[in-house]
Amino acid sequence: MRRLLLAGILRRASSSPSSHHHLHLVRALSASSPLPASDADLRKYAGYALLLLGCGAATYYSFPLPPDALHKKAVPFKYAPLPDDLHAVSNWSATHEVHTRVLLQPDSLPALHDALAAAHGECRKLRPLGSGLSPNGLALSRAGMVNLALMDKVLGVDAKKKTVTVQAGIRVAELVDALREHGLTLQNFASIREQQVGGIIQVGAHGTGARLPPIDEQVISMKLVTPAKGTIELSREKDPDLFYLARCGLGGLGVVAEVTLQCVERHQLIEHTFVSNADEVKKNHKKWLSENKHIKYLWIPYTDTVVVVQCNPPSRWRTPKFTSKYGKDEAIQHVRDLYHESLKKYRTKAESNDPEVDQLSFTELRDRLLTLDPLDKDHVIRINKAEAEYWKKSEGYRMGWSDEILGFDCGGQQWVSETCFPAGTLAKPNMKDLDYIEELLQLIEKEDIPAPAPIEQRWTACSRSPMSPASSSQEDDIFSWVGIIMYLPTSDARQRKEITEEFFNYRSKTQTNLWDGYSAYEHWAKIEVPKDKDELAELQARLRKRFPVDAYNKARMELDPNKVLSNAKLEKLFPVTEVQHEK
């Protein structure tokens, strides 16, 4: 660099009037004859100064700064588009995402069989994806996935036995529509109906109703396509142990290709929604659990409000009044007012005149409100109180088909942790379900957690699937399911990161203070794998206390010895030792 600069100076010097003067200076700098120490130092530092000035001049003229540079807006960095062969797959809350070059969509049982056989032979990953809705991204794998969206046919309906056989890629909503003409429907539903049937049974999904088991209990038989043993048929009669294990198999034992489900007659329900409080709930809890076919509580933190939702078949002897005291606009107007007030506080008056606000649903308004300051406890409390008032003004009845009534608007993108724990029997509820909630609400207030509403509490009967969180050999056992949430109402990466950190702090405190005391275990679609090695070891040991991990891993090694169906989450939850693998 120095030689180049000297050459440039020489060229400029030769063309200038004072070329001789500069030439002598350069010669002096480059001379090799010995000089006195002080003279040599002087010329050395003079050379450094010239070098610095030359570099600055070269930089200035090579990369000129535009005159309006100080007034230009920063342009955000834009990622290049993904290659055509790279698929981005995320769950519905966009909390987990992978990019993969292998996303297969077989359209038949033979095609699925061949795909798994090839992956097994080449030791490649091919994780069953389902609809990919699980909040924890349980089905995601960047190494490769298989989706059964093209295997979505109804294969047969037996109206007398009230059963239906379907390909596992059919969505719940599509299945319900297909069953309608036969006068049938499913026994129970989860909150949303976009799941594929194969996925909804594999993760132990559930609805609500202390007499109704999780959805995997509706499975009578199924065809499981495995990497090592091909397609196998399982039922209560054919290999019952593996059948019950595979019903809630987390996609680790095989890809569920076909399922026969027990249905019920299509029926209507009357939903009664009303607001209560903790004391009233305690007085009536046992009676409500036994009397109502479907029931759930929506607890609102920092208030004494409990929203009770009861659903039952219509009674010919009693017709409820369906008229409500308030219209939809009246019920939600105070939430709109809070939004306008909050905009003035956090933004400008101009934005408070947004005409779109009047078209937003309650859950959309709640998201808008939370976006303003999602982690400010006082702001969240104001929103929770507005929600309590909204439900008070929304009390009343509505009637519809069961699949319509049992759906629930969960709100926008969110983090969620749902635990399941025993609650006694239907004849003798132990009331620990209400104790759990009481402790949880006290913990939230003690720790100043900006916990939004609702905390949803539901119940189910037990399941005979040993990997189900509601698994029990006692037929009359009931289980309570409690979900805590934090919404992700914004696309701002920094804000989402802050909400995520606060949510995991919230979840950690509930785990430390509540889970062991109530034998609570997380829903498989909502369990998160800790990054800390010690915490992971504790989780693995804890899972072994509740679930038949050795039997599950043994079946995995028999049906999938090359771990084609596994992903990082499954491997961390259920690590297979070398000894187990060799066996």
Curated annotation (Swiss-Prot):
Ranges annotated as spanning the membrane: 45-61
GO cellular component, one term: mitochondrial membrane
Gene3D superfamilies: 3.30.465.10, Uridine Diphospho-n-acetylenolpyruvylglucosamine Reductase, domain 2
Obligatory cofactor(s): FAD
Keyword set, alphabetical order: Membrane, Mitochondrion, Oxidoreductase, Transit peptide, Transmembrane, Transmembrane helix
EC number(s) from the headed UniProt entry: 1.3.2.3
GO biological process terms held by the UniProt record: L-ascorbic acid biosynthetic process
Protein name: L-galactono-1,4-lactone dehydrogenase 1, mitochondrial
Organism expressing this protein natively: Oryza sativa subsp. japonica
